[in-house]
């Protein structure tokens, strides 16, 4: 977990390094072998919550796709829906550990994930929130948490198939 002071110190250190080309995500597409990584636009400056400055990625490998959203909450998810950058995906890494403040019906209607993985451990925040889990279960064929399954590895294939491996709680 970062603090605002730590975050600002990191940014200042990066700014002092001349080999750094960019500091924040700029919307772009990166080709990586047979895969494509789409870096989503950031919210315009002004959000008070650093979670809503998370980098969003859509990873595509042929017919397999994954949406990775970091700690994004409703404000950033709504922004991405409004920007029309949320595609149908095979896999969704649940935003903000499955928090109630990080899921909207509009976002899920756009993403239509087959599998949702919630990265979460024992915590005092109540993550994942039962309402968020219920929303994921309404659209996805499978909802998994790392608290229950341990490490979750998804192997995606270009024909759209995928394998799920779990273990090591």
Predicted ranges, named:
Residues 1-169:
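Non-globular, low-confidence helical/coil segments that flank catalytic cores
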């Amino acid at each position: 977990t970062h603090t605002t002071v730590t975050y600002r110190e990191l940014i200042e250190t990066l700014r002092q390094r001349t080999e750094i080309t960019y500091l924040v995500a700029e919307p772009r597409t990166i080709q990586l072998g047979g895969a494509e990584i789409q870096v989503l636009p950031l919210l315009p400056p002004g959000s008070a919550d650093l979670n809503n400055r998370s980098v969003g990625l859509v990873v595509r490998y042929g017919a397999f796709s994954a949406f990775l959203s970091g700690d994004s909450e409703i404000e950033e998810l709504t922004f991405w829906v409004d920007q029309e950058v949320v595609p149908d995906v095979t896999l969704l890494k649940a935003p903000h550990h499955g928090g109630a403040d990080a899921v909207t019906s509009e976002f899920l209607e756009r993403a239509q994930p087959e599998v949702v993985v919630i990265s979460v451990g024992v915590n005092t925040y109540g993550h994942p929130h039962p309402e968020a889990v219920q929303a994921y279960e309404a659209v996805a064929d499978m909802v998994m948490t790392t608290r229950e399954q341990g490490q979750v590895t998804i192997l995606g294939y270009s024909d759209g198939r995928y394998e799920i491996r779990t273990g090591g709680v």
